Amino acid sequence: MGMLTSLNSSKNHLSFMSQGVILITGATGHLGANLLRRLLSDGDTVRVFQRPGRDHEALQGLEVDIVYGDLRDPESVEVAVKGCSRIYHCAAMVSTIDGDQAHKREVYEVNVLGTRHILEAALRQGVEKVVVSGSLSATGHDPERPSDESMPFYPFDRQMPYGFTKHLVEHECLRAHAEGLKVVVATSCAIIGPHDYVPSRMGQVLIDYAKGSLRAYIPGGFEFVSTLDIVEGHVLAMKSGRSGQKYIISSTYMSVDELMTLFGEVTGCPKPRLRLPAGVMAVIAEVADRSWFRLFPNRPRRFTPGAVRLLQMHRKVDHRKARDELGFRPTPLSDAVRAAYEDFVRRGVIVPKV
């Protein structure tokens, strides 16, 4: 059973309940930490669902209630959901490795079963609406045109467990919608921005770049989204998103070369000299993955075959649906990179070079 506590013991929990509590899962993650701050600045009362023992740096100084528990435990999920009027389900186990069977099972249980538990509890507790964070990895890809919400996911392509589970998450949302729950999927691309405490994959690349430890990179490209934009997309989806629908939230497509140039402009550090051919890196990643897989099957790695494949797909998206139905308007990605860098400097993660 989950345990309810608060970072602000002077706040009466019953007053929180009467004001219409918003629940956020994954509030210590990159998206969740930024969404939490946005909701608090809007004057909302927020509860977060947190695994015991997790770092609370992302929550320090913020007036929130915490329910401790695990998405895989329906009872603790029920405790978290009870009394909430709306839910942002941002928590997920993100991974670009295939991993062993135990790893795949954990990704499935956290992402798919965890979402199922949230949605089922929301139905039982009479929650008004749920916004679930989706992933572009669960959206179909056509090299001839940008991806949109109508593009089907093809399960027999070479898929990473993470992308496949996020596809199944969308099915869980459709099932809950059919059962009467108002639920919307807000699909994210690669996120860049401040309050990146873990840090994220892109955040770590920026840190390494600023420290001069990023020796090489590979060409490619991807669709990126600023924390400001992905948070705005979630808030808009909660406000006016149609139940049973998903909306892709993106700022812009950017090549890796362009991203490295932008990192250089923001940090004042030179671009890595070594630009590895994509084909060569793909082979190296495959060989290294097989070697590392035998020794360390579940250890995160920078250049996995899955990550290389994603960059080489040059995925672009069409976010007209979010623009037309939600009123979404993207902001410059350069602002997000600068905000991320300044936040890392403020927290002492990066020491600026003079």
Residue ranges and their predicted role:
Residues 54-60, 64-113, 121:
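NAD(P)H-binding glycine-rich loop region in Rossmannoid oxidoreductase-like domains
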Residues 117, 168, 201, 218-238, ...:
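Substrate-positioning beta->alpha
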Residues 109, 113-162, 184:
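Conserved Rossmann-fold NAD(P)-dependent oxidoreductase catalytic core, especially the SDR/UDP-sugar
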